[in-house]
Amino acid sequence: MAEVLNFEHNGITVNATESPEAMGGLGDNVIGLVGTAPKADPLIPRNAPFRINSFTTHALLDPTGSEEGTLYHAVYQILKVVKVPVYVVIVEAGATPADTVNNVIGGVDPLTGRKLGLAALGSVPEDLTIIGAPGFTGTKAVASEFASFGKRIKARVVLDGKDASVADQVLYSQELGGADLGFDRCLVVHNMPAVYSKAAKKNVFLSPSSLAIAALAKVKQWESPGNQVTYAEDVSRVVEYNILDTSTEGDLLNRYGVSYYARTVLGGFSLLGNRSITGKFISYVGLEDAISRKLVKAGQKAMAKNLTKSFMDQEVKRINDWLQTLVADETIPGGSVYLHPELNSVEKYKNGTWYVVIDYG
């Protein structure tokens, strides 16, 4: 007889399908700093990220005890407050302050293709959540470079304000801005805090962003750094603050997106301010970044899959289940995930494109 073309073997077929992977938590803070450390251990590479996670590795920034450069105190103040990884990129001090600033901004070596200064932070193997360069970010030119880089890697940026009066600081704040330029993720700090230096045997003033970076790293990415008590023993410029008075200098600075250090009933000097230079809550920026980073990582494995209805439904359910864990631990008050009702179309699917809406508040 001829072959039966529709014949099927009367047996058993076992198909095993793994359930979608759990997406996990949002992750912790990781800091990236650029600055100088002229007495750093020769084994630490220059213009390359070096990971510091303890006072032992921090000591390599200055084995001589002279505490020279901008990175020594900045990293020390962070580690005093919270134990998080701090990646530092050490640049050489130039012949002039302007040369040093250029080294901090960095770029790409035209001969070797090596990334220098700020650009070197792009090769950090962990996801940076906070970046800065205490002592160098008090001008619009440098602030713009850090804002742009922060936008690209989805990290918040802590900037030095001008060493100026409140009125002049407000004028400077009006020069900065533009959410599409990355300034919505920039926290600008007004006055310089003083901390004790063993080398100087007295208090020394640090750049405004130094202690603010520590305050931002101390809390979760979706929490406000405002009202955090710092280790400041004094400030370069006293800012008038009264929680009941809306006419104070402090209130004026905050209304223009500038944070500052002032004495409060909590004792000592606290960081006051919780908005970026554009007025957006810096904690909300942190939440957006954290969720975005998690979705990018979780979506990597799904990029090669066919866009079938069951696949898309499964991915939507997976993200929605994960979002509900954020609701359960009170990271967000609520949220839902669904396919965009208008942007998704047959032509988009044919092109491998689909849109998922993550609605949270």
Task: Report the location of each language-model feature.
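N-terminal assembly/attachment segments of tailed bacteriophage virion structural proteins
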Residues: P45-A93
